[in-house]
Design a protein with these regions (language model features):
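Short glycine-rich substrate-engagement loop in P-loop NTPases that contacts/grips substrate
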Residues: 103-110, 147-190, 211
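Walker A/P-loop nucleotide-binding motif
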Residues: 121-140
Length: 278
């Protein structure tokens, strides 16, 4: 109460220093100018308008920041990487040699990314091949190109499947975790374009023929059942995927792929870039 009374007293003291002048505002001709001791004369109505505009600008800036966060910010803030170097990946820094399989796959990735700029394009894409050939690099590049160019703006997200499952499992014993199964299924199911990176790794670290757990398949089904625009990278062939996942889940993964020629395949013709060190 003492602070409030002091504040009111200070305001009244300030008001006592304001003098009304005989001159009128050129804009608000019915309003006399006033002057605060030691300051230039001003029009109260002009001052109020200036304050209102400043407040409106603050609100608009906040709204714009929230808008950008809801779309462009999703890729930057909500993506789940297990290799943070992938954040730097673009089409421009994807290294290839002319007339190679990798160069052809780069071109195809650019073309498919262009298709995803059409919101009516409903099909998944699978990028398959051995580890280290650049599958994830291409997927991130495609995602960035769409996120930057699509109109109107749309949310895009990159998620390492293995890391996703680890974080969801950790949430079981962590009250208040943002990585609950329900939240992640909702987030991944709702973005415009999603990358599921390294699909199959969550089941194949121990044995390539090991079936993915029922819980993992339920989580993946919950995500893919809500979607029709997903980029999937995997080290596995369709035959190997069939040993890991049940047919209902596979049908969600392969949605629209055959019709749209949506497979980018790396063979032994493309070497593991991470192994070429000398």
């Amino acid at each position: 109460m003492v602070e409030l009374n002091s504040s009111i007293g200070a305001s009244f003291n300030l008001l006592r220093k304001v003098k009304a002048l005989p001159a009128y505002c050129e804009i608000h001709t019915d309003c006399r100018l006033v002057q605060l001791e030691g300051h230039e004369p001003f029009c109260p109505k002009c001052a109020k308008k200036s304050i209102d505009e400043r407040n409106n600008n603050v609100v608009l800036e906040g709204t714009w920041r929230n808008y950008r966060r809801a779309f462009h910010g999703v890729l930057r803030c909500d993506s789940i990487f297990d290799d943070f170097e992938l954040k730097k990946a673009t089409f421009d820094n994807y290294e290839t040699e002319p007339n190679t399989e990798a160069a052809g796959n780069l071109l195809k990735a650019r073309q498919i990314a262009g298709k995803y700029l059409d919101r009516d394009y409903k099909a998944n894409t699978i990028i398959t091949g051995a580890p280290g050939v650049g599958k994830s690099h291409l997927a991130v590049s495609m995602l960035k190109a769409v996120n930057k160019t699509i109109q109107p703006d749309a949310s895009c997200l990159f998620v390492s499947v293995n890391e996703l499952m680890r974080l969801i499992k950790a949430s079981f014993d962590s009250k208040g975790s943002e990585f609950t199964e329900a939240r992640m299924v909702k987030l991944l199911g709702g973005v415009n374009l999603l990358v599921l990176d390294d699909l199959g790794s969550e089941a194949s670290f121990q044995s390539s023929s090991r079936e993915a757990s029922e819980w993992v398949q339920q989580v993946l089904f919950g995500i893919l059942n809500k979607r029709n625009r997903t980029l999937i990278t995997t080290n596995l062939t369709s035959e190997e995927l069939a040993k890991i996942y049940n047919p209902k889940l596979l049908s969600r993964m392969y949605k629209g792929i055959a019709k749209q020629n949506g497979v980018i395949k790396f063979t032994k013709a493309t070497p593991d870039k991470r192994m070429v060190i000398f």
